[in-house]
């Protein structure tokens, strides 16, 4: 929640709260304050929706999007409601011009790592699902997503880092989902900073965490998903050498990538560019200084960040690395979906028109198969021209006589399963290795 307008002003700010009754909530503050008067609160979802829209439209004004209201509740309630909505409106039922079907969903931050949401993602891992989720994850939770989740595009927003030295722990205890750790000396971490603990046993105390309210002096408070058990070896607060400010409250970084997806409109003059390294605007780049190992880990986990084009002498912010959780550039699955959707539409169009053309009806015979094969070849030729498929692509068809001999019950039912295509989606470069050989001996001219 965000609290504003309270006197004294120390009550104001944005906080994690605990709802205690239908009319009361609590939140943590450091120090003591006189009784407060006045003020208003704004639920997180209100400011988050505004931030989503602000970042989305910072990319341009040529697109619109829907806001799908799922009702009041927590992340579990929201994921359950969304699953019910998609089940009632599956993208497999979509036909051209239909409404209420959505290709991708930009979900709230609070859904990150939620067990119900993760279970829902498992329902959309098939190659024919054609449904995607843009998810803001964190340094503490990005490992919740697996490389089977081709439906998930995850991104970590630029985190808040402080500057602090390595500091040995003297205690670590767990209670009710939270760890309280004590450092040898004052650590310099403040609530809202991210920090790393290493070297503890059990390992559940280790990781990168968000400092919560109550972090001060030589005390660190952070959340963990389960009880690690009693500590037997105490580790260390890992040093951080470079400070970094968190994103502003008006930013929802992954909304920029969401816009980039929605602006795809494939044609021969508007080819589909790779998702990786795409320009995005109004977003904060992830800090790079001192984070080489972390950035390598995130890339290997197929977790995206906002970067810059500095390596190429370009000041724009860009998407790194543009992949879904299975490691494919988003355009890979966009291509697969485009081929499925357009093949269905164009073949259906040919069959329907063929049933309404007395001069040239479409029959289930060799000529009819040839005509459908030609229709599908046009689809694949367009995929090449639009930047979605690597040339060449050839559509094959089992000859009529062979097919009906091998599948005798299909002809009476009007079923033909003999069309096929194998192709490779088009993609861009990710890394170039360039070899330079330097010598002191000039070559003979």
Predicted segments — roles?
Residues 2-5, 15, 42-163, 188, ...:
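Surface-exposed assembly/interface segments
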Residues 4-44, 164-194, 198-241:
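Small/polar beta-strand repeat architecture
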